[in-house]
Swiss-Prot record:
The basic functional RuBisCO is composed of a large chain homodimer in a 'head-to-tail' conformation. In form I RuBisCO this homodimer is arranged in a barrel-like tetramer with the small subunits forming a tetrameric 'cap' on each end of the 'barrel'. It comes from Spinacia oleracea (Spinach). CDD domains: RuBisCO_small. This is Ribulose bisphosphate carboxylase small subunit, chloroplastic 1. It is found in: Plastid, Chloroplast. Belongs to the RuBisCO small chain family. InterPro entries: RuBisCO_ssu, RuBisCO_ssu_dom, RuBisCO_ssu_sf. RuBisCO catalyzes two reactions: the carboxylation of D-ribulose 1,5-bisphosphate, the primary event in carbon dioxide fixation, as well as the oxidative fragmentation of the pentose substrate. Both reactions occur simultaneously and in competition at the same active site. Although the small subunit is not catalytic it is essential for maximal activity. Keywords: Calvin cycle, Carbon dioxide fixation, Chloroplast, Photorespiration, Photosynthesis, Plastid.
């Protein structure tokens, strides 16, 4: 049994305790979300990919939670490869950015899943 080292390895969101997703695994996740009918927007964050305290000593709701959206959400997207290609584009634009993938349910108007699709080196 292996224990995860507690120092220097921050955890982020869903799937963060797994090794980085391969392209095939990312395609499978995206396909699952598209089959569910969820909209796949992408977000990126250059400064910090985790919740941090910005305005006070205690964490507030807005501290480090809102990222910049990459282009527009992919409404009507049906091809997982197209979505993964967008992830590759985000990785090139700001190469030191975190890339977050979201599954948004437009019927219930809620975010159903969110996970880090790419972390820069050193995280």
């Amino acid at each position: 049994m292996q224990v995860w080292p507690p120092l220097g390895l921050k955890k982020f969101e869903t799937l963060s305790y797994l090794p980085p997703l391969t392209t095939e695994q990312l395609l499978a996740e995206v396909n699952y979300l598209l089959v569910k009918g969820w909209i796949p927007p992408l977000e990126f964050e250059v400064k910090d990919g985790f919740v941090y305290r910005e305005h006070d000593k205690s964490p507030g709701y807005y501290d480090g939670r809102y990222w910049t959206m990459w282009k527009l959400p992919m409404f009507g997207g049906t091809d997982p490869a197209q979505v993964v290609n967008e992830v590759e584009e985000v990785k090139k634009a700001p190469p030191d950015a975190f890339v977050r993938f979201i599954g948004f349910n437009d019927k219930r108007e809620v975010q159903c899943i969110s996970f880090i699709a790419y972390k820069p080196a050193g995280y």
